[in-house]
Regions:
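Conserved N-terminal glycine-rich FAD pyrophosphate-binding loop of Rossmann-like flavoproteins
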Residues: 1-5
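Long, intrinsically disordered, low-complexity tracts enriched in Ser/Thr with interspersed Pro
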Residues: 6-10
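Short glycine-rich His-centered loop
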Residues: 14-23
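Flavin (primarily FAD) cofactor-binding/catalytic cores of flavoenzymes
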Residues: 23-265, 278-348
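Post-kinase regulatory C-tail/linker adjacent to protein kinase catalytic domains
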Residues: 263-273
Length: 348
């Protein structure tokens, strides 16, 4: 699999990448100076425990079945949010005789050749997978619960439908609008659960409805500020978000930025979550920071840490890509030019 990234090179913050937009191989081939010497590979973190109420951390790791103990002043959890598939309960799934796959395990489309495929979920992964499968499948049902059909210029082989109500037979799927379709494959593009099995109970981290709590600014554990979570925000430019979060955390560790008291951070975390829920948004979307929320978040961190603001051309690139993604399946083929004055021009 070598999916092309949906982000432009200029907002990936990786200057050596030349492909626009880069694929999986180009991204994997990036090497940051010094990382191979300092990183320990093929090692699994077994447990992380706070010592002296978070003043230091006991970390147990497993390498070649040998568990060793290390102690650190701080811990950054950078495990991402795409490792534990969320598999929704589907009534009658035990009667289904076709194949079921989660997007986490998707690699190539060749096994779907000539098949009728139901893709459940129309987020970025669901759409990308449906488009790739559509090049070889007989029919693709893109099923979702969004209030309106997506306005993309999908190829004729892709048919938008409601979500799944139940499975009625070997390959018979009943949709929520009562329509019946036959599918030999079901591909679940239903997201992921946030799990941190390596964090001990003493870390006092909860993940109810995929909200990591209690975190200050989506980064700092309010009780243990030397424990940070990097990369939780969704619907963002991930590399820029993670860069600013890293700088914020390191500034706090170095002492150039002073954090509020633990109690104040905990109160702020609870207040932010309550505000999110009271506004009518789903609790599970607390870490979503679309567009203006993202820019405000980055500006807040920049002001606190004295960092440069996000350049305007990056915001323009994000807006252009988002707009084209909404209506065009080939948005990744867009050609971008940034003029000397910072103006962004694009064409296909």
């Amino acid at each position: 699999m070598n999916w092309r990234n949906s982000s432009r090179k200029k907002i990936l913050m990786t200057p050596k990448i030349t492909a626009l937009p880069p694929g999986k191989i180009e991204i994997q081939n990036q090497r940051i100076g010094g990382l191979p010497l300092s990183a320990q590979y093929n090692t699994r973190v077994v447990e992380v425990k706070p010592v002296f109420d978070g003043q230091s951390w006991d970390v147990y790791v497993e390498d070649a079945k040998i568990i060793s103990h290390h102690q650190f002043d701080a811990v950054m959890v950078c495990t991402g949010r795409y490792s534990t598939p969320m598999v929704p309960p589907i009534l009658g799934i035990e009667r289904y005789k076709g194949h079921v796959m989660h997007s986490h395990n998707y690699r190539t489309a060749h096994c779907f050749t000539g098949e009728a495929v139901l893709v459940l979920g129309a987020g970025p992964s669901g759409i990308d997978i449906a488009l790739e499968i559509a090049t070889v499948a007989e029919r693709v049902y893109l099923c979702h619960d969004q209030p309106k059909p997506l306005t993309k210029d999908f190829p004729p082989v892709i048919c938008q439908e409601n979500g799944i109500l139940r499975i009625d037979g070997d390959h018979t799927v009943v949709l929520k609008n009562g329509k019946i379709v036959s599918a030999t494959w079901i591909v679940l593009c239903t997201g992921y659960n946030l799990t941190y099995g390596f964090l001990s109970e003493g870390c006092r981290v909860t993940t109810d409805e995929n909200v990591v709590f209690p975190l200050y600014k989506h980064i700092f554990h309010a009780d243990f500020p030397s424990l940070a979570f990097i990369g939780l925000p969704m619907r963002v430019i991930p590399f820029i978000i993670m860069d600013y979060q890293n700088r914020f955390f390191l500034s706090a560790l170095e002492g150039s930025v002073k954090l509020p008291s633990c109690e104040a951070m905990k109160q702020q975390a609870a207040k932010d979550l309550a505000k999110h829920v009271s506004s009518g948004l789903a609790k599970r979307h607390f870490h979503c920071l679309p567009k203006m929320k993202m820019w405000n978040y980055l500006e807040d961190i920049a002001n606190i840490c004295g960092l440069p603001k996000v350049p305007q051309y990056v915001k323009d690139l994000y807006d252009i890509t988002s707009k084209e993604r909404e209506c065009k399946c080939q948005y990744k083929d867009i050609k971008i030019r940034i003029l000397p004055d910072g103006t962004v021009r694009y064409s296909y």
